[in-house]
Amino acid sequence: MADLISISLPDGSRKELPAGATAADLAATIGPRLAKDAVIAVVDGTERDLTFPLPHGAEVSIVTPSTDRGLYTIRHSTAHVLAQAVLDLFPGATFAIGPPIQDGFYYDFELPAGATFTPDDLERIEARMREIIAERQPFIRDEIPEDQALELFREHRYKCEIIRGAADDPMAATESGLVRTYENPPNFIDLCRGPHVPHTGRLGHFTLMRVAGAYWRGDETQPMLQRIYGTAWDTKEALKAHLHRLEEAEKRDHRKLGAELDLFSFPDEIGSGLAVFHPKGGTVRRLMEEYSRRRHEQAGYEFVYSPHISKEGLFQTSGHLEWFADGMFPPMHLHDHGGEEGIDYYLKPMNCPFHILIFRDRTRSYRELPLRMFEFGSVYRYEKSGVVHGLTRVRGMTQDDAHIFCTKEQMADELDSLLTFVLDLLGDYGLDDFYLELSTRPEHKAVGSIEEWDEATEALRAAASKKDLDLVLDEGGGAFYGPKVSVQARDAIGRTWQMSTLQVDFQLPQRFDIHYTGTDGQRHRPIMIHRALFGSIERFFAVLTEHYAGAFPAWLAPVQVRVLGVRDDHDDHAFALAARLKAAGFRADAVEANEPLGGRIRRAKTEKLPYILVVGDDDIANDTAGVNPRGGEVERGVAVADFVERLAAEVMEHR
């Protein structure tokens, strides 16, 4: 029948519809609930509006709000409502771009005379957005010629810039070369690739979060725009839960806790992204490093050390100056050894070239492989000031860097044992909810043949598949020198952090021309595996601080026990008990009774100490103490020897 079309559904079934039927019509034939919930459709792999006429034979799935694609669309459409509200309320304002992002959306604006948005402005904007939503304005898609688009957006220079580059800009261009727009009648139109919800009435569970400065196209030479961030969800309950998570995340912010708990700071005199660790933070970091060193020694790693700078030739050979120069600090030009022209030195951005030179320093035999090198190596990355963020994005960091040199035959076993080692060690620090991500060859920045990349990628895939964890594919996300598997860890409030990485590298061994002598007496190229377990000490410190909300487990806490006397005449015993605990290997202190006991206990709790011991007359007589555990019930008259045994067990078991 010529007037019918056949549509394939995700479950393999088929629907017959009248020719010209839309995705919305299809949803209605499946059921009234789906028709009500439908946001967009995926037609032959491409996202489309519900008004899209379906072609005969198409494979179609209907997208609902609770899915990732549905939420993405809701946030995208809400960004358009934000732009309309701002242009309504601020005459002379111009708008730039407004994409959906993880958990929300933003839109960039430029206000007349360099004005900025205020908190009161956000309230007004949000109120206007709710009016637009109540009007149920449709999202109407169109495609227009470039000259018409330029005339339509003549008062908005950033839109005109996008239009002029439409052929290369997926935010505006279509397959036909026309400029794609979406209109919300009667007064708003925007450049956009879409798709969008059917009308603004499908939105509403949103809030505007904050305003920040943002350079146009992320370029520091371009104008600074005003970026309004918001979040949008499919239900009121989901929005409320997200805002609660944000509140909890704010309480756990490592920058805030770092100051409150006297862990670290970023002095202006040193520079952006360069941290100093205070004694308490230094204690936590030392414990992290010491335990890691011990585990690496048990696993057969050999410890190496390398300098912080090198002549440029090393990074030319490694490819860093070709592929990573934007992330490196500028060179230091030195007249080395009296040479007239001098030599450029660079702060090292990575440790791997130095470890390769150690391998290459002498002839290697197959009997030495696998050779596992490990270093807590300081590296330096020139991060833009706009992306520097606490300890999670710094310019100077220490990586727990390992490089394994092995034969091709050993590679599979090494990757398997490496991944087991990584997951076990992260578990000892209290992270045990993981998934894995496999990052493949980047399209533009890559060295080596496609065949070599495929071989390395498959080796990583095989190792990851042996673990009982979800494996997510990150197409094109590999480093320029090889693919990687990264361990993604979820913290106590469900956020995901990229932790350890494992990379197979066929390229650097070739660039440095390293070899080993095989069983046949011939020279062979080793496989090189890069592995950073923490990523960097600084970033891992931040993750643990937020995971534990500053309340580090007893084995990591900078102070494990504080001893308090009930009265000032108990102070001598309190300090003597603290000294006994120190002698037993614990981190303990005591505080004089110069204020009421309740105030001293409260202050100790704000420092998030695992244990507070209180001693009075009976405790002095019986060698006992009142034990006040963090988050637990107070126990009175506990024998000090029993407490020592308990604390020792917690430390031994990493609790």
Regions found by a protein language model. Name each.
Residues 1-76, 81-94, 102-104, 108-655:
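NTP/phosphate- and nucleic-acid-binding module
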Residues 97:
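Conserved P-loop NTP-binding catalytic core
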